[in-house]
Amino acid sequence: AREGYLVNKSTGCKYECFWLGKNEFCDKECKAKNQGGSYGYCYSFACWCEGLPESTSTYPLPNKSCGRK
């Protein structure tokens, strides 16, 4: 299994979060069907996800750099 920052596939940005550590939003996003992770929490103001399948993309995406062209 992989781990990494969840990434928004349309923008290339990380999922932002402000409540560090245990974070319901990150945990929910991580476990969502399209991500398939086992546990998510907030690390350095972005959602970090563990237990991801190899098919799930994580930040940074090769062709998108979040707002920078």
From Swiss-Prot:
The modification Cysteine amide is found at C66. Residues 2-67 form the LCN-type CS-alpha/beta domain. Keywords: Amidation, Disulfide bond, Ion channel impairing toxin, Neurotoxin, Secreted, Signal, Toxin, Voltage-gated sodium channel impairing toxin. Expressed by the venom gland. Residues 67-69 form a propeptide. GO terms for cellular component: extracellular region. Disulfide bonds join C13-C66, C17-C42, C26-C47, C30-C49. The keyword Heme does not apply. InterPro entries: LCN-type_CS_alpha_beta_dom, Scorpion_toxin-like, Scorpion_toxin-like_sf, Scorpion_toxinL, Scorpion_toxinL/defensin. Pfam families: Toxin_3 (PF00537). CDD domains: neurotoxins_LC_scorpion. The keyword Signal applies. Residues 1 form the signal peptide. It is found in: Secreted. GO terms for biological process: defense response. One of its GO terms (molecular function) is sodium channel inhibitor activity. Has the structural arrangement of an alpha-helix connected to antiparallel beta-sheets by disulfide bonds (CS-alpha/beta). Beta toxins bind voltage-independently at site-4 of sodium channels (Nav) and shift the voltage of activation toward more negative potentials thereby affecting sodium channel activation and promoting spontaneous and repetitive firing. Belongs to the long (4 C-C) scorpion toxin superfamily. Sodium channel inhibitor family. Beta subfamily. This is Neurotoxin Cex6.
